[in-house]
From Swiss-Prot:
Disulfide bonds: none annotated. This is Large ribosomal subunit protein bL19. The keyword Transmembrane does not apply. One of its GO terms (cellular component) is cytosolic large ribosomal subunit. Keywords: Ribonucleoprotein, Ribosomal protein. It comes from the Bacteria. GO terms for molecular function: structural constituent of ribosome. InterPro entries: Ribosomal_bL19, Ribosomal_bL19_sf, Translation_prot_SH3-like_sf. It comes from Ehrlichia ruminantium (strain Gardel).
């Protein structure tokens, strides 16, 4: 039974992953473009925030983004293989030591900033 579910999940992932999904971790700043359906029709909305957590669970993989707008914290949980997602772009790579950044939920202002991770494997010439 579990093999059937595993095969089904793999097939659905292949069908839904027609776009490029970048590699990212918690602490990275992401820009997600998604379709929003409302009474006026369909529009494209961009959400940019820090990835608080990432959950790898096959077809049900998701990640949570957090941004601060007008001194209000906004969190958005997004499913990785959702058909409403147009694109995912990594803006900055963050340097953190945790997989789940729940301590960030109570931070505002300068204390909520994350240092940028510099990839030293690429040699600048």
């Amino acid at each position: 039974m579990s093999n059937l579910l595993k095969e089904f999940n793999e097939q659905q992932i292949k069908l839904l992953s027609n776009r490029e999904i970048p590699k990212f971790k918690s602490g990275d700043t992401l820009r997600v473009t998604m379709k929003i359906f409302d009474s006026a029709g369909e529009r494209i909305q961009t959400f940019e925030g820090v990835c608080i957590k990432k959950r790898n669970n096959g077809l049900h993989s998701s990640f949570t983004l957090r941004k601060i707008s007008y001194n209000e914290s906004i969190q958005l949980q997004i499913f990785l293989y959702s058909p409403t997602i147009e694109s995912i772009e990594v803006v900055k790579f963050g340097k953190v030591r945790r997989a789940k950044l729940y301590y960030m939920l109570s931070l505002f202002g300068k204390s909520a900033r994350i240092k940028e991770r510099i990839d030293r494997s690429k040699k600048s010439s």
